[in-house]
Swiss-Prot record:
This is Ubiquitin-like-specific protease 1D. Residues 261-274 have a biased composition (Acidic residues). Its EC number is 3.4.22.-. The gene is ULP1D. The N-terminal regulatory domain is not required for peptidase activity in vitro. One of its GO terms (biological process) is response to salt stress. Induction: Constitutively expressed. Proteasomally degraded upon salt stress. The active site is at 438, 461, 525. Keywords: Hydrolase, Nucleus, Protease, Thiol protease, Ubl conjugation pathway. Belongs to the peptidase C48 family. Residues 99-120, 142-165, 176-196, 221-253, 275-286 have a biased composition (Basic and acidic residues). Protease that catalyzes two essential functions in the SUMO pathway: processing of full-length SUMOs to their mature forms and deconjugation of SUMO from targeted proteins. Cleaves precursors of SUM1 and SUM2, but not of SUM3 or SUM5. Able to release SUM1 and SUM2 from conjugates, but unable to cleave SUM3. Protease activity mainly directed at deconjugating SUM1 and SUM2 from their target proteins. Regulates salt stress responses and flowering time. Redundant with ULP1C.
Amino acid sequence: MTKRKKEVIDVDCSEKKDFVIDWSSAMDKEDEVPELEIVNTTKPTPPPPPTFFSDDQTDSPKLLTDRDLDEQLERKKAILTLGPGLPDKGEKIRLKIADLEEEKQRRVLEGSKMEVDRSSKVVSSTSSGSDVLPQGNAVSKDTSRGNADSKDTSRQGNADSKEVSRSTFSAVFSKPKTDSQSKKAFGKELEDLGCERRKHKAGRKPVTRLSNGWRLLPDVGKAEHSAKQFDSGLKESKGNKKSKEPYGKKRPMESSTYSLIDDDDDDDDDDDNDTSGHETPREWSWEKSPSQSSRRRKKSEDTVINVDEEEAQPSTVAEQAAELPEGLQEDICYPTRDDPHFVQVCLKDLECLAPREYLTSPVMNFYMRFLQQQISSSNQISADCHFFNTYFYKKLSDAVTYKGNDKDAFFVRFRRWWKGIDLFRKAYIFIPIHEDLHWSLVIVCIPDKKDESGLTILHLDSLGLHSRKSIVENVKRFLKDEWNYLNQDDYSLDLPISEKVWKNLPRRISEAVVQVPQQKNDFDCGPFVLFFIKRFIEEAPQRLKRKDLGMFDKKWFRPDEASALRIKIRNTLIELFRVSDQTE
């Protein structure tokens, strides 16, 4: 090993040794250890993370100022005039308007409440102080203060409302206390705020009275569901009570309002529906109805009724809901399975007869068939009527708007719906309409041979939601197509109506616009259609003439009569299920 390598090894060994410090020699014994000093330092608060709002949050009425709230409300109402042309027919706009009006009303009530609380505190501090004056002194003091304030009107502008509120409440406490005052000390104030009315009508939503004598009913879509456990057989006394809404006042020399429209139709088709064929009525009677959840209509429009035109009418005793027994069979066929036009009803279909539910096609078709069976024995008019089921109008609409090259063959297949029935020999044809989750009714009135007034089409709608013009137009085209088909044969040898009317039938079909009772909610359109049929069959003459149109009126029957039909149909079906279960 060389000397140089040995020196390198010695250096490396010395570097690897621990370095030891002699603190006793490095530090003097008299030196003191410095004290630890803790200094509080405030770190700057980090800026909050950016907040991202969704469209719903930015459009929330609570985030708007009063001015912006009023501007949005006016703008939405202006847009609502275009509702029929919108994809959802203005439904979303109506809901937005309802939210804005609710927020505006909340702010008004909240501001009034804050003013009352502030005035109450002023009154409390005044009455508890030692300088409470008698009534005369208080009046003189207020008078003198008023004179002093009148000298400087520039400082009075912002305090006018507060001074009026304070003086009003102070006057209540400055007067001698009497029994009547103790009971109605704040009667006027509570009446202005609407609290007195809510006290007498607990649990009910307030009715807004407008300056023109009309009243604004709350949104029926937000009403509370009062009927529970309906299918379990619980008797709903509240659900069966007749509506307490006042009804129409009879005016002297008042007749029904209607007009006759007799115009020629153009044969231009509106829609292009390419449909291959039509099923028979029997095939359609087994079709599943849409679920009840999809039948909910959202309606946020307020209903306005005229108080001056209504008065209370004695309501009839409502029929009680029967209990639903257990162990019933799943379905029945009415009147029997052997009947060629029987209607099948499942036990589950009874759910639509619960309060606030929308009637389904099986129940509607059942009751129309039930009316035919019940009235035929006592009234001859039922034999001269033809009832199409609830699925017919959709097929009618497809047939009259079909634009294929085989239009004639298409109509021949469509005629299977009334195979073997001469429609023009009937006195009345009933066509139920179901569109946009709403029910309405069309009645075709056919005259006899002595009457040359022509055919009349009636459209009865308890809410006025359906397009009367398009529905009547489709029915007219249907009657014309049937007339063209029958004219190809020797049908004219034995005409059921006047020869003059028959030769010019396309121009002798008119529409009579009539007024009918209107429902007070948005879920009784089905019972109203069935009650229209029931009442019409009971009261209509053998053949309807123009002079008979006076039977139609908004006071034709009470709305609660039609609403009560829901319970009657349910009880009838339960009894039929019982009888069918016993026989089988």
